[in-house]
């Protein structure tokens, strides 16, 4: 470990402890870190089961559909005239224009419902004058209930263009006056960062960029394990419970069954004798090398025109590259690390939605209302540039 990295770790220990979170490890195990991303323990391919528990299967389906409708009352299709791709979107409006809106982008192989429990937790944690934030999300092309092109194109440039279309369309459909925070998990964080780089002078009211559990160097190294994982993951499941059990008990991709009851069914399509994946991850392989290259530098430098605040939230002890270390020490972004490997994995928004919500609400309040935040947290509002009286 470099001296710069040690100095960095020492600096943030007190900051993270003060926030009630686990600190970065001083001697991270790089191989363990990489496994958090894309390389859960591969399992032998499943044969299609015929012993479906129809009652259990139907109950999970009903819970999934009811929860999705309750959390996201607005579910629209946005069709991009340039590509013909139909994007499934979900929107939970804020209580008023005084509450923020989170625009969320999921990662590869995931879907919008990875943010469902987070949306519920944000309502519980925001709790200011009976207000609650909004949350908008959409299924990336070829994921969830969105379509894709033939031949498929999952390059970062293309899915960034998709993101630009979605955000423009979202603003056109809704008279937005709330402050907006962009929130991306894994590949979604790279897409939103790329969007800000490509649109430095946009007129939207972006206040912050939040990236969940992605570090450029670690992600690029972890991609080497993806082909084996994609080949060896089950191709079919007998019912929803079997799929949930695989995500939690076998692959350890997820750690919360409550969240998995909504997020996992959204990944699967029912066929006559079971369930198959909606997303063909093998089709994305030719584009993997485009996804994360330059992410750290772009994250540090994007959004300067709008003075966009930035937050990086990690599930465990990642080895940060020099750009991220220097950027954090210079105060260019806030870093939060959750280091409880028994309860958290790569999908931290699903595993610990309450803790993530607390972190997001704190980030929003210090950026939306800094004077009010300082007064509440520290009992005073600093008068920068004024005289200090004894």
UniProtKB/Swiss-Prot annotation:
Signal peptide: none annotated. Its EC number is 3.1.1.89. GO terms for cellular component: mitochondrial small ribosomal subunit. SUPFAM superfamilies: alpha/beta-Hydrolases. Residues 100-332 form the AB hydrolase-1 domain. Pfam families: Abhydrolase_1. Residues 19-50 are annotated as: Disordered. It is an enzyme of class 3 (hydrolase). It catalyses: [phosphatase 2A protein]-C-terminal L-leucine methyl ester + H2O = [phosphatase 2A protein]-C-terminal L-leucine + methanol + H(+). Keywords: Hydrolase, Serine esterase. The active site is at 186, 213, 346. The keyword Hydrolase applies. Coiled coil: none annotated. InterPro entries: AB_hydrolase_1, AB_hydrolase_fold, PPase_methylesterase_euk. The keyword Hydrolase applies. GO terms for molecular function: protein C-terminal methylesterase activity. Belongs to the AB hydrolase superfamily. This is Protein phosphatase methylesterase 1.
């Amino acid at each position: 470990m470099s001296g710069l990295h040690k100095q960095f770790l020492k600096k943030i220990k007190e900051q993270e402890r003060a926030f009630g979170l686990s600190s970065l490890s001083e001697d991270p195990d790089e191989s363990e870190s990489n496994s958090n991303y894309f390389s859960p323990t591969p399992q032998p391919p499943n044969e299609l089961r015929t012993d479906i528990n129809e009652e259990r299967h139907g109950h999970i389906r009903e819970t999934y559909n009811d929860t999705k409708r309750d959390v996201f009352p607005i579910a629209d299709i946005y069709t991009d005239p340039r590509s013909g791709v139909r994007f499934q979107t979900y929107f939970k409006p804020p209580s008023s224009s005084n509450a923020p809106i989170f625009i969320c982008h999921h990662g590869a192989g995931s879907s919008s419902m990875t943010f469902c429990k987070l949306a519920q937790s944000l309502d519980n944690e925001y709790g200011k004058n009976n207000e609650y934030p909004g949350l908008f999300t959409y299924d990336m092309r070829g994921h969830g209930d969105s379509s894709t092109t033939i031949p498929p194109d999952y390059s970062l440039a293309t899915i960034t263009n998709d993101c630009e279309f979605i955000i423009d369309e979202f603003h056109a459909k809704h008279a937005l006056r709330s402050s907006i925070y962009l929130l991306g998990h894994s590949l979604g964080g790279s897409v939103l960062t790329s969007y800000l780089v490509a649109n430095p002078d946009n007129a939207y009211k972006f206040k912050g960029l939040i990236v969940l559990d992605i570090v450029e160097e670690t992600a690029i190294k972890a991609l080497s394990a993806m082909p084996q994982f994609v080949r060896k993951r089950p191709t079919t499941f007998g019912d929803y419970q079997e799929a949930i059990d695989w995500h939690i008990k076998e692959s350890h991709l997820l750690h919360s069954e409550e969240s998995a009851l909504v997020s996992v069914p959204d990944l699967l399509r029912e066929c006559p004798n079971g369930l198959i994946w909606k997303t063909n991850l093998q089709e994305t392989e030719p584009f993997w090398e485009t996804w994360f290259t330059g992410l750290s530098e772009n994250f540090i430098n994007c959004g300067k025109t709008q003075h966009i605040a930035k937050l990086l939230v990690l599930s465990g002890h990642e080895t940060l590259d020099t750009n991220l270390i220097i950027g954090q020490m210079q105060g260019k972004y806030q870093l939060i690390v959750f280091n409880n490997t028994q309860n958290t994995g790569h999908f931290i928004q699903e595993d610990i939605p309450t803790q993530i919500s607390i972190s997001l609400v704190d980030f929003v309040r210090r950026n939306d209302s800094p004077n009010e935040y300082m007064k509440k947290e520290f009992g005073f509002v600093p008068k920068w540039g004024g005289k200090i009286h004894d």
